[in-house]
Regions:
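Short beta-strand to alpha-helix junction loop
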Residues: 70-71
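Glycine-rich loop-to-alpha-helix module at the N-terminal edge of alpha/beta enzyme cores
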Residues: 38, 62-64, 78-86
Length: 386
């Protein structure tokens, strides 16, 4: 039969999606009523009032039309100032691109530095979206396991994974899902490797304001020789509780930012116009950031102390972000079995085998409320110690 006349024939989608995973998504759906949710990496705090009132004011003032695609000059300048103040990163406002969330900034960065079949090193386990993003544009993710004792990079493993197709190293410190914060010496060595092999560094710094234990955030862009090859990624979602407002940015060398601007010009155009000024105002809400951080610090202490003495669980005290990465192999259960058992006990958890290198671990978000953390601890203890 002539295919053109067969109305039951359906065209197929591109093969690039055939093996594309969705990471933690199945476990990020709202759980049954009454179940404590320890899964979503989303601040439970309300967005700072100055941000809300500014966004509303901008809407009422008619800021609903097209605007400068790269971001308003005032916002780009504010981001450059913020990077210097908080991370000692020196960047010109012209080399900042405001994006619809940090995810979009990541995608633009990968499109900027990777040609088809180029390899990208991921320090595994890593955030669930890095690998599929790289794959979808034709890049090749190369997962390099971190040290499972503390989740810090194994430099020898990084070096041995480099080939003539390697183009970039992905850095995420503080790290989702492990909570690791890389030391200055580790960042310096990663930069040294990148210089030696002429590689780009994509540095996801979305959790840079959430560091515990008196640690410090060190960006590869602040290390000698690193600025010229590092694209910094960050955004407003985690620090200022603005996940649904979708504002992020990338900053880096001129040639990389110019290419990323072209990506945005031919896709999203720009973030919502009324969010430009609201995002700028958020950068001045330091009192909210301090209050949020104090709450996370307390919740981290509660959850670690509440779970660390349970037989079969191995807990590494998280150094940053708001995640706890728990080794459950000592319980005799797989991570999926553990998550299923926890759900029956009334706590929703994420089995980390859904991402490369996460087998045997559970990811917990202590961005949950203090009340939910206390109740979740009680339920898990009752289940595991009965």
């Amino acid at each position: 039969m002539d295919r053109g006349l067969n109305h039951s024939y359906m065209p197929t989608v591109a093969t690039r999606f055939d093996n594309l995973g969705v990471g933690f998504a199945p476990y990020l759906q709202p759980p049954p009523e009454g179940v404590i949710r320890w899964t979503v990496g989303e601040p439970g705090f309300p967005t700072p009032e100055p941000v809300i009132s500014t966004a509303v004011s901008e809407l009422l003032d008619g800021k609903t039309k097209y605007t400068r695609g790269q971001g308003s000059p005032a916002l780009c300048e504010a981001v450059a100032h913020h990077l210097m103040k908080t991370s000692k990163i020196s960047v010109s406002p012209e080399n900042v691109l405001i994006t619809p969330g940090a995810k979009q900034a990541l995608l633009y960065s990968y499109m900027t530095v990777l040609n088809p079949s180029d390899e990208a090193i991921l320090l595994s386990p890593s955030w669930a979206s890095y690998e599929p993003m790289i794959s979808i544009i034709g890049g090749v993710p190369v997962n390099v396991p971190v040290d499972r004792k503390n989740f810090h990079p194994d430099m020898d493993a990084i070096r041995s994974s480099i080939t003539d197709r390697t183009r970039m190293i992905m850095v995420n410190s503080p790290c989702n899902p492990t909570g690791a914060v890389y030391t200055r010496e580790e960042i310096e060595e990663i930069v040294s490797i990148a210089i030696e092999h002429d590689l780009w560094i994509i540095s996801d710094e979305i959790y840079s304001r959430l560091i515990w234990n008196g640690g410090e955030h060190v960006s590869p862009a602040t290390i000698e020789g690193g600025k010229e090859r590092t694209i910094v990624i960050s955004g407003w979602s985690k620090t200022w509780a603005m996940t649904g407002m979708r504002v992020g940015f990338l900053a880096g060398p001129k040639q990389a930012v110019r290419a990323a601007v072209k990506c945005q010009a031919n896709s999203a155009s720009h973030i919502p116009t009324f969010m430009m000024e609201a995002a700028r105002v958020a950068l001045d809400c330091d009192d909210h950031v301090e209050r949020f951080s104090d709450a996370y610090r307390l919740r981290r202490k509660l959850i670690v102390q509440g779970l660390e003495d349970i037989p079969g669980l191995r807990i590494v005290n998280p150094e940053g972000a708001f995640y706890l990465f728990i080794d459950v192999t000592g319980t005799g259960m797989s991570d999926v079995q553990f998550a299923d058992g926890a759900l029956k006990a009334g706590v929703q958890l994420i089995p980390a085998s859904l991402i490369t290198g996460g087998e045997g671990f559970i990811r917990v978000s202590y961005a949950a409320s203090e009340e939910d953390i206390k109740e979740g601890i009680s339920r898990l203890r009752s289940w595991l110690l009965e």
